[in-house]
């Protein structure tokens, strides 16, 4: 089922900072500048993240003067829902319009253990992975922290209708998260904070294609967030073909950074490995992958790829997927095959946005 909403006009000239970009201490600092007590920050966050109001007038325990100051300083309406697709398995894909007319995707996935959301960090992507729809059209801009936070808020509002909640999230949507590092970290801290969305750090996962300097930086952060690497190949030659970023950040150097992260944090790392028919899915690839990961505290997530019309890759046959998994297991690698969701909608990352861009150019 698909629901489509009319687009809003661009409103670039009147753009104010999003209130969802502010961490609690930043809100306290702003209140101090306004001559307001800092305990109001907790009240404001309660309205934003617990009651999830859509306008300042609903913040009834704040004075009209403070509500006016908030309205004059910060946008509270960040996203406009353009399209909402619901899969037969309960997966929901949202296409949101931003203030400047660009669109982004967010996906809600339902699991036995709860509801997970996949968020976007950029409008487009500059990494150029040859199998990904997100890179079509290149990178337009980074999202502000508040635009990432607002994705979770909007999806949670949709879940409020059925008294459900977002229990976990993955930063695996459109864009390279580490290419927007500061806004990513602001988002994670707001999302994790008890006064914010209060999603536990161990229920959040950040994925990167392998920007090595940011991996070292991420290892020093004081957040116990799960970490994943988009690997997709067991050697440099094949990875450079699939992921041009490997030409800048070589696989041996990436593995050194990963080992540093694991040793520094003590946390297990996840390797995402998309299976592309005839490209990286043979037994010899599995054997090479097992050798590459030997001694690394890790888990491999095998991903049967979604078909993207603009790309030439095909799905690996089911029996070959199981053989690849068995080859890894026989060599002591912790591995699972990712459950497919949203297969009957535009579920691959960037597909719905690419479809929307095509409509715009007609």
Swiss-Prot record:
Annotated compartments: Cytoplasm
Domain Radical SAM core: 111-344
InterPro entries in the record: Aldolase_TIM (IPR013785), Methyltransferase_A (IPR040072), RlmN_N (IPR048641), RNA_MTrfase_RlmN (IPR027492), rRNA_lsu_MTrfase_RlmN/Cfr (IPR004383), rSAM (IPR007197)
GO molecular function, one term: tRNA binding
Binding site for S-adenosyl-L-methionine: 175-176, 207, 230-232, 306
KW Cell division (keyword) present: no
SUPFAM superfamilies named among the record's database cross-references: Radical SAM enzymes
Catalysed reaction equations from the record: adenosine(2503) in 23S rRNA + 2 reduced [2Fe-2S]-[ferredoxin] + 2 S-adenosyl-L-methionine = 2-methyladenosine(2503) in 23S rRNA + 5'-deoxyadenosine + L-methionine + 2 oxidized [2Fe-2S]-[ferredoxin] + S-adenosyl-L-homocysteine; adenosine(37) in tRNA + 2 reduced [2Fe-2S]-[ferredoxin] + 2 S-adenosyl-L-methionine = 2-methyladenosine(37) in tRNA + 5'-deoxyadenosine + L-methionine + 2 oxidized [2Fe-2S]-[ferredoxin] + S-adenosyl-L-homocysteine
Additional observations: Reaction proceeds by a ping-pong mechanism involving intermediate methylation of a conserved cysteine residue.
Role played: Specifically methylates position 2 of adenine 2503 in 23S rRNA and position 2 of adenine 37 in tRNAs.
UniProt name for this protein: Probable dual-specificity RNA methyltransferase RlmN
One BP annotation, GO: rRNA base methylation
Name of a matching Pfam family: RlmN_N
NCBIfam families: rRNA_mod_RlmN (TIGR00048)
PANTHER family attached to this UniProt entry: 23S RRNA METHYLTRANSFERASE (PTHR30544), RADICAL SAM CORE DOMAIN-CONTAINING PROTEIN (PTHR30544:SF5)
Keywords: 4Fe-4S, Cytoplasm, Disulfide bond, Iron, Iron-sulfur, Metal-binding, Methyltransferase, rRNA processing, S-adenosyl-L-methionine, Transferase, tRNA processing
HAMAP family linked to this entry: RNA_methyltr_RlmN
Family: Belongs to the radical SAM superfamily. RlmN family.
Cofactor dependency: [4Fe-4S] cluster
Cofactor note (record): Binds 1 [4Fe-4S] cluster. The cluster is coordinated with 3 cysteines and an exchangeable S-adenosyl-L-methionine.
Binding-site residues for [4Fe-4S] cluster, renumbered to this chain: 125, 129, 132
CDD domains in UniProt: Radical_SAM
Principal location listed in the UniProt entry: cytoplasm
Top-level taxon in the UniProt lineage: Bacteria
